[in-house]
Amino acid sequence: MNRRGGQTAFAAIARNERAIAAFIPYSSHLTDTTLITHGADLVRTWRVQGIAFESAEPELVSQRHEQLNGLWRAISCEQVALWIHCIRRKTQAGLDARYENPFCRALDASYNARLNARQAMTNEFYLTLVYRPGHAALGKRAHHGQAEVRRQLLAHVRRMDEIGSLIETTLRSHGENHEQAITVLGCETDSAGRRYSRTLTLLEFLLTGHWQPVRVPAGPVDAYLGSSRILAGAEMMELRAPTCRRYAQFIDFKEYGTHTEPGMLNALLYEDYEYVITHSFSAVGKRQALAYLQRQRAQLANVQDAAYSQIDDLAHAEDALVNGDFVIGEYHFSMMILGADPRQLRRDVSSAMTRIQERGFLATPVTLALDAAFYAQLPANWAYRSRKAMLTSRNFAGLCSFHNFYGGKRDGNPWGPALSLLSTPSGQPFYFNFHHSGLDEDCRGQMMLGNTRIIGQSGSGKTVLLNFLLCQLQKFRSADADGLTTIFFDKDRGAEICIRALDGQYLRIRDGEPTGFNPLQLPCTDRNVMFLDSLLAMLARAHDSPLTSAQHATLATAVRTVLRMPASLRRMSTLLQNITQATSEQRELVRRLGRWCRDDGAGGTGMLWWVFDNPNDCLDFSRPGNYGIDGTAFLDNAETRTPISMYLLHRMNEAMDGRRFVYLMDEAWKWIDDPAFAEFAGDQQLTIRKKNGLGVFSTQMPSSLLGARVAASLVQQCATEIYLPNPRADRAEYLDGFKCTETEYQLIRSMAEDSHLFLVKQGRQAVVAQLDLSGMDDELAILSGNARNLRCFEQALALTRERDPNDWIAVFHRLRREASAGLR
């Protein structure tokens, strides 16, 4: 090797690399939450949760915008500056779940593989307050002893605390009212006694593009930060870490738009690449700000083709500045886009510039002083801020609105982990739960409201969504000894294939076919005896003609007589045999009840014996499991509907014994059209949470649901609302009935019907989520329950004689594929 040539090559590399400590302004941690720079500036950082903007009303967005402007006005002075970072980066999303059921395991694995095919992204906001004591104070420090310097520093920290308290109070009310709306970055100690700094972790990410914990150093911070080699080219930087290399390119504003509004840069929150947007704002004095506006107005007035509206705007701005409506400060913007491939990075830069220019800004790649743009990302790095502009605090609040997406709650829910992970158009994961609880609260074991309403027109994917959530619920079966029971009140057999795949029991109640119900075989308890008195009195009621007191007494005596018999002898026909017919009232009672008995007491068979006069009672919800009941036929039979409903609901109440319990109603309007179900649904909406349960209602008929007499309970007592796309949604139903906002209503109408999107609303938060199972044909065939799949399902059951789901599922898929290929 040529020694001289080698030296020249290494010298060239050395010239391109400089020790970065000189570009890092930080000296040390003054307190757990505060850094001090070499220039004695104090630095404190908060993570801001951000506010869900997708469905927020324009009035609320404007109100929050003015709150931010008011905050920046309140804290502004020449000693205060702000750095705000919007970081969009890749994240690992997932839920650890164990499923005993093979189909649920396969569904979850396929679904997660589909989710992982698209990289999950997250948006994070960090607000940094920089407090500059002032040059005079800095100059005096050298002449004071250590005690005086310490006293001054403590005074500055107290001032930081005052400003920080105002920031925290405002931003907590700005978003959801919980502690995690804004969190100060501090230090934490691990089990081995090592102290880590979350502030230094953020700064390390800005310098390396990698998120990794950073320990609190014993020496100077500037010499400790930065574990990547930083190579700056003409328009691109390389951040070379020991294990990988990343490339970065910068964009800044060459020219600003004529106006700003909150959320102007929201389009960037949906991009599929990583970036860091940096804003900094340092207020100037009112005199300097007024002089700036006057100069701007004078320059416009001297232009021959002056825009008079702009001159008037500046005049109004001067008045507003004097009145204290806003402050003016030096503003700096940069966007660092990160990538592993230079060619893809250039495409991402082009996409970002397009998004920015669509909002009226002229964006340009940074090609001069690239390293200055890089180091200007560090808070309090005053010297490297390039292309500064004078901006009002109102404009600053519009560019930094803290708009984000609602991400749900991953852990600490009443039943533990989130029920399911859903994708969103922004790529940010959404952790879905039926329950709605505070993001900062550990609510495990608490019995909270979890009732859920699903509204979607026919063909919008409502059945698939219901069945998918039912499958995801199965993770809670093995979570503890109490287990899980689900009861699905189905219509048109939409859930039958799914429930059978879960190895559940599915009951089809059809006119004229024995139901397997026998209420008289219930255990002889006070509660059951009272129920039987009510049920049998209803059966004996003719044409709304109530029983006489004597008939009630006769019936009660017969019931108690039968309940003392062995269970195998208890039948409706046996009850009839134990009613004496000494009076006309008793004979009339026998005649009425005879319609429900196989032996009607007159040598014939009652027309409705198949409902309750069965040899054995096959209805049993006592064991944890999944149960389905198809009401397609009996819900249209006015004579049998209410008695059957009463019995089903009485038995279901037995299952609500503290175990996790969910009942689901498809086409709920049809079920609650029956008085028994209506009363049950209305009462349980209020009380089911106390029994560790919840109800899930779905319908494609909002008007029928809203017209029910228990509509108020069904609307008001829901923790979660799901709205599927409906371009024909009725304004009155959604706004007045379901209390959606205008923005939410427009979202529901604008979502494409085949987009697999839906709006999830919990409290004041809402998010557009997605359940796209495209390509998962086998799983969809079980979740969808359409007529063709039901035919194949019935054939599969016949061929396998209803054996284990693993047997009939394989045959079902074979038959389905043959039918699709035209072979059957």
UniProtKB/Swiss-Prot annotation:
Pfam families: CagE_TrbE_VirB. Transmembrane segments: none annotated. Keywords: ATP-binding, Cell membrane, Membrane, Nucleotide-binding, Transport. ATP binds at G456, Q457, S458, G459, S460, G461, K462, T463. It is found in: Cell membrane. GO terms for cellular component: plasma membrane. GO terms for molecular function: ATP binding. Induction: Cotranscribed with ptxABCDE. Activated by the two-component regulatory system BvgS/BvgA. Belongs to the TrbE/VirB4 family. This is Type IV secretion system protein PtlC. It comes from Bordetella pertussis (strain Tohama I / ATCC BAA-589 / NCTC 13251). The lineage of its organism: Bacteria, Pseudomonadati, Pseudomonadota, Betaproteobacteria, Burkholderiales.
